[in-house]
């Protein structure tokens, strides 16, 4: 670890370190302009959470500086950490390499030790989520990353050699152009929240919510609350309701017992994180089809937040037979018996379906999904998995007809929808270093190759004066 004692000292060291790492110190990107005369961004990143910040940092380190991040949230509220993430700490063990991408002075551990005193990091088991948000705010500020907040991407269209992006800010819409779009729109960003139809059809909208909604838990004080789903998010929401004074909280799960196997841990190795995307289609499908049958159990500390309360109930074998209103109560019939509640929280995950992403409407029908590419053998059918986008090696969408829709490959889906194609390298922190490197290498390759003729012409027309022997540009060995 470093011996810096103040954040000012650390930030000065980071500036020196970035200058040292800036090699070769030569700009290589060519400026592009739309026929209208409007400027064109090389890369626009939708989402300025931890993934978007890491990607922008990595691109700028590669001297791709004409970058813009757009986020619909206010400054300091990007991502889920202080909105709908209801855990107390990150679920990932603190050994991860985060958006620092291996640069120790930028790492959360270095920042945390300076903020809280030397040795504070060693006492942590996992990073508190509020501290993580503070770190991301500092990370963005110290790197001076270009973020526009409270901006919503409304529409993505192909226009000539570029992507035409319609954005909304402060009630007004405008158009910007980009050569590349990276979507880091979060876990709900490729299809939306999944609410079981039996719930949405049977209840008024003020009697249920999705676990990723902004829920007024204080209003649930003294009420009977049900939570559908026994994953970590379900337990986080149950614990929050209990801590806010709910009369009782009932987790309703289909399974007969709580699952204990964390199958995803088997994929947390260099082999899987680096090369899952290089496996054959049949191998990737078999793994992901098997994976989809498991619900990750809550971490031990999350489970303890609920079980310490006498008014917490875990109801196994409780799939939903009927859901409706009986008087002023939410009445639920399950195989294990009926239950009357005041409010229902659906920790039921997210839909992955590009046709349900509003901003992709003009292009969605031309985006290849797994069912277009792969026909699974008997016994491995999985309609939900078949709707996942079939991505290229660098997270790019693939067009069903590339000649008719060439710009589709300039949209990179860096989120939960990529897991079937490239593995768990952008759905959390454990794979961040692998995912960002793969994405950025692909983007820089595409941008360079697209300007190939111009780069060739530059070399053929080199006519520079001799370089002095002691010049920093003299690379002669």
Predicted regions mapped to residue ranges:
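Flavin (primarily FAD) cofactor-binding/catalytic cores of flavoenzymes
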Residues: 1-73, 78, 121-232, 236-244, ...
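Core mature regions of organelle-targeted
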Residues: 76-86
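Flavin (FAD/FMN) cofactor-binding and adjacent substrate-gating region
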Residues: 86-118, 265-279
């Amino acid at each position: 670890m470093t011996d810096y004692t103040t954040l000012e000292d650390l930030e000065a060291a980071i500036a020196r370190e970035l200058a040292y790492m800036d090699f070769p110190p030569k700009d290589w990107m060519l400026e592009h302009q739309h026929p209208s005369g409007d400027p064109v961004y090389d890369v626009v990143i939708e989402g300025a959470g931890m993934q978007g910040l890491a990607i922008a940092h990595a691109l700028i380190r590669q001297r791709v500086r004409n970058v813009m991040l757009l986020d619909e949230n206010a400054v300091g509220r990007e991502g889920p950490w202080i909105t709908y993430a209801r855990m107390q700490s990150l679920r990932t063990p603190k050994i991860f390499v985060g958006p620092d991408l291996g640069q120790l002075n930028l790492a959360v551990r270095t920042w945390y030790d300076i903020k809280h005193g030397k040795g504070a990091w060693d006492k942590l088991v996992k990073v508190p989520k509020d501290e993580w948000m503070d770190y991301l705010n500092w990370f963005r500020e110290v790197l001076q990353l270009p973020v526009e907040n409270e901006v919503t991407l409304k529409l993505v269209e192909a226009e000539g050699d570029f992507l035409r992006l319609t954005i909304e800010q402060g009630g007004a819409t405008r158009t910007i152009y980009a050569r590349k779009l990276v979507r880091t729109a979060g876990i709900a960003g490729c299809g939306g929240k999944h609410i079981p139809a039996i719930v949405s059809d049977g209840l008024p909208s003020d009697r249920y919510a999705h676990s990723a909604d902004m829920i007024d838990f204080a209003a649930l004080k003294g009420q009977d609350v049900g939570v559908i789903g026994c994953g970590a998010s379900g337990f986080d929401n149950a614990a929050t309701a209990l801590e806010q004074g709910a009369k009782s909280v009932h987790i309703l799960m289909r399974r007969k017992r709580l699952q204990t196997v964390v199958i995803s841990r088997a994929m947390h190795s260099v082999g899987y994180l680096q090369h899952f995307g290089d496996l054959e289609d049949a191998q990737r499908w078999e793994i992901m089809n098997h994976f989809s049958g498991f619900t990750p159990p809550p971490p031990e500390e999350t489970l303890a937040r609920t079980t310490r309360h006498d008014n917490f109930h875990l109801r196994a074998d409780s799939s939903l037979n009927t859901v409706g209103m009986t008087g002023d109560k939410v009445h639920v019939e399950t195989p294990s018996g009926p239950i009357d509640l005041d409010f229902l929280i659906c920790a039921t995950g997210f839909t992955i379906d590009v046709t349900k992403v509003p901003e992709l409407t003009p292009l969605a029908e031309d985006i290849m999904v797994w069912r277009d590419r792969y026909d699974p053998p008997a016994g491995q059918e999985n309609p939900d998995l078949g709707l996942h986008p079939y991505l290229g090696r660098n997270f790019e969408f693939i067009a069903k007809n590339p000649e008719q829709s060439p710009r589709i490959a300039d949209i990179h889906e860096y989120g939960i929808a990529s897991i079937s194609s490239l593995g768990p390298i952008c759905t959390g922190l454990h794979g961040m270093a692998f995912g960002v490197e793969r994405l950025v290498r692909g983007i820089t390759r595409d941008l360079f190759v697209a300007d190939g003729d111009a780069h060739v012409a530059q070399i053929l027309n080199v006519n520079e004066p001799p370089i002095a022997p002691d010049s920093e540009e003299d690379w002669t060995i």
